[in-house]
UniProtKB/Swiss-Prot annotation:
<feature type="binding site">
    <location>
        <position position="424"/>
    </location>
    <ligand>
        <name>Zn(2+) 1</name>
    </ligand>
</feature>
<dbReference type="Pfam" id="PF13341">
    <property type="entry name" value="RAG2_PHD"/>
</dbReference>
<keyword id="KW-0863">Zinc-finger</keyword>
<dbReference type="GO" id="GO:0003682">
    <property type="term" value="F:chromatin binding"/>
</dbReference>
<protein>
    <recommendedName>
        <fullName>V(D)J recombination-activating protein 2</fullName>
    </recommendedName>
</protein>
<keyword id="KW-0233">DNA recombination</keyword>
<dbReference type="InterPro" id="IPR015915">
    <property type="entry name" value="Kelch-typ_b-propeller"/>
</dbReference>
<dbReference type="GO" id="GO:0008270">
    <property type="term" value="F:zinc ion binding"/>
</dbReference>
<dbReference type="GO" id="GO:0033077">
    <property type="term" value="P:T cell differentiation in thymus"/>
</dbReference>
<feature type="binding site">
    <location>
        <position position="482"/>
    </location>
    <ligand>
        <name>Zn(2+) 2</name>
    </ligand>
</feature>
<keyword id="KW-0156">Chromatin regulator</keyword>
<feature type="compositionally biased region" description="Acidic residues">
    <location>
        <begin position="373"/>
        <end position="383"/>
    </location>
</feature>
<keyword id="KW-0539">Nucleus</keyword>
<keyword id="KW-0479">Metal-binding</keyword>
<dbReference type="GO" id="GO:0005634">
    <property type="term" value="C:nucleus"/>
</dbReference>
<dbReference type="GO" id="GO:0005547">
    <property type="term" value="F:phosphatidylinositol-3,4,5-trisphosphate binding"/>
</dbReference>
<dbReference type="GO" id="GO:0080025">
    <property type="term" value="F:phosphatidylinositol-3,5-bisphosphate binding"/>
</dbReference>
Length: 528
């Protein structure tokens, strides 16, 4: 096992606990940002471009016949293989949290319809469900089982909000474990059936599940009711005859106490379990190999990688399966840093063949890519310490149809921490926000001299009102070094003086005309 650090070039703050990674044709895509999508990527799906140990995120598009897919954190995700010898597959997404902390009970089918060097297009379809529909939840698992030429979707575990009748202002966002029911979903017709098994007594969430043929193994998990991580190991067997399905459960020995573990597949019958937690404040640094053969499971401990000191001493970590024995791990940066999106990312390669193929990352996962689950038991997720926001403007893309990936290749020259002029004093280590609109990067403005270059607004001594005026107005700006060139090339236009109209008095008294007696007698005789 090898551990390698990657540097995030752009928009790394979008990668948060609860996010998911999808693999299509060897290309890894990110889904499930914490906030609502920005205009630069309205779909919320990004292509992870990892080259030369640098991670870049590029927006993806949806087809016109796609439904709306909100960014969901902690959903249940699994793959559905195509028929025949086709390598194409679809992803099934169920449940999860929206940015408004609402829980989803919908199920989506996501597939790739077009892939070019500059643009990737997906199709997302919402599947209608009927019968015993699973309630809205998160932190659960979804798997596909195959029996007698048929396929079924199996949903188990997770957390949900307390019933609406019991919700008060103080307990509005309180969550509980879902009932330990097993749901079978007919993928073709959308019919759902729930099963209550006597072996499953307590609800579980953030557990690990791996499937092979008609059998699902459920390992570990966290019980919110008891606040424990029981070393449980369940075996679910699903038989699909011509009549009603038959679901049986058995308790096996040799379980592991782990929650939020990450499973990656390294072979046809071999999986690797990494990461997770063994208590509320202790990470699980041990790795295990899971082998599924001859209708049985074998879990053995394997040699762990050389964890870096940052990973060993951090309080939390998160990650997702990238496929073929590769896992993306993330840890938050040091608290003393002023840059709020300073996340550190590592790629853990569990397969020896993949250690030599850094660019080939494909995924064949049979379980949910479990993520950090302490957002509900401890205030990590919504605290200011780990609150990040995405800078959508760093993509510099107004229309996804005209997106040019070559525009992102020059970020080293047009970054926020360049030396914009001779008197530039912006340093990444000492910079603090100067304008009220700044958050974690200094405000910059484009100088229109020549081919154009970016300068810091603070180095140009621009006031905040002037900066806002220049950003809203459609005018050219010239920095302090090129402003004299602009004056010499342009002749000032003569200002047209407007004549000031005198204001009329609102209450002007009319002059009274006096009529003499002679005029009165004349008028009287005239009308007689």
């Amino acid at each position: 096992m090898s551990l390698q650090m990657v540097s995030a070039v752009s928009n790394s703050s979008l990668l948060q606990p609860g996010s998911s990674l999808l693999n299509f044709d060897g290309h890894v895509f990110f889904f499930g940002q914490k906030g609502w999508p920005k205009r630069s990527c309205p779909t919320g799906v990004f292509f992870l471009d990892i080259k030369q140990n640098e991670l870049k995120m590029k927006p993806a598009a949806f087809s016109r016949d796609s439904c709306y897919l909100p960014p969901l954190r902690y959903p249940a995700i699994c793959t559905l293989r195509g028929n025949g010898e086709s390598d194409k597959h679809q992803y099934i997404i169920h449940g999860g949290k929206t940015p408004n902390n609402d829980l989803s009970d919908k199920i989506y089918i996501m597939s790739m319809v077009n892939k070019t060097t500059k643009k990737t297009t997906f199709q997302c379809i919402e599947k209608d469900l009927g019968g015993d529909v699973p309630e809205a939840r998160y932190g659960h698992t979804i798997n596909v089982v195959h029996s007698r030429g048929k396929s079924m979707i199996v949903i188990f575990g997770g957390r949900s909000y307390i019933p609406l009748a019991q919700r008060t202002t103080e307990k509005w966002n309180s969550v509980v474990d879902c009932l330990p029911s097993v749901f079978l979903v007919d993928f073709e017709f959308g019919c759902c059936t729930s099963y209550i098994l006597p072996e499953l007594q307590d609800g579980l969430s953030f557990h690990v599940s791996v499937a092979r043929d008609d059998t699902i193994y459920i390992l570990g998990g966290h019980s919110l009711q008891n606040n424990t991580r029981p070393p449980s190991l369940y075996k679910l067997k699903v038989d699909l005859p011509l009549g009603s399905p038959c679901v049986t459960c058995s308790i096996l020995p040799g379980g592991i106490s782990v929650s939020s573990g990450i499973v990656t597949q390294t072979g046809d019958t071999e999986f690797v379990l990494v990461g997770g937690y063994q208590s509320d404040n202790q990470k699980r640094m041990i790795c295990n190999t899971i082998v599924l053969e001859d209708n049985k499971i074998e879990i053995v401990e394997r040699v762990s990688p050389d964890w870096t000191p940052d990973i060993k001493h951090c309080r939390m970590w998160f990650g997702c399966d990238m496929g073929k024995g590769s896992v993306l791990l993330g840890i938050p940066g040091a608290n003393k840093q002023l840059i709020s999106d300073a996340n550190y990312f590592y790629i853990l390669r569990c397969n020896k063949a993949e250690e030599d193929e850094e660019e080939e990352l494909t995924a064949q996962t049979c379980s949910q890519a479990s993520t950090e689950d302490q957002g509900d038991s401890t205030p990590f997720e919504d605290s200011e310490e780990f609150s990040f926001s995405a800078e959508a403007s760093s993509f510099d893309v107004d229309d996804i149809d005209t997106y040019n990936e070559d525009d992102e290749e020059d970020e080293s020259e047009t970054g926020y921490w360049i030396i914009c002029c001779a008197s530039c004093n912006i340093d990444i280590n000492t910079w603090v926000p100067f304008y009220s609109t700044e958050l974690n990067k200094p405000a910059m403005i484009l100088c229109s001299s020549g081919s154009g270059h970016w300068v810091h607004a603070q180095c140009m001594d621009l006031s905040e009102s002037m900066l806002l005026q220049l950003s809203e107005a459609n005018v050219k700006y010239f920095c302090n070094e090129h402003v004299h060139l602009n004056k010499g090339l342009q002749t000032p236009k003569k200002a047209v003086h407007l004549k000031k109209q005198p204001m009329k008095r609102l209450h002007k008294k009319k002059t009274m005309k006096l009529t003499t007696p002679v005029k009165k007698s004349f008028l009287r005789r005239l009308f007689e």
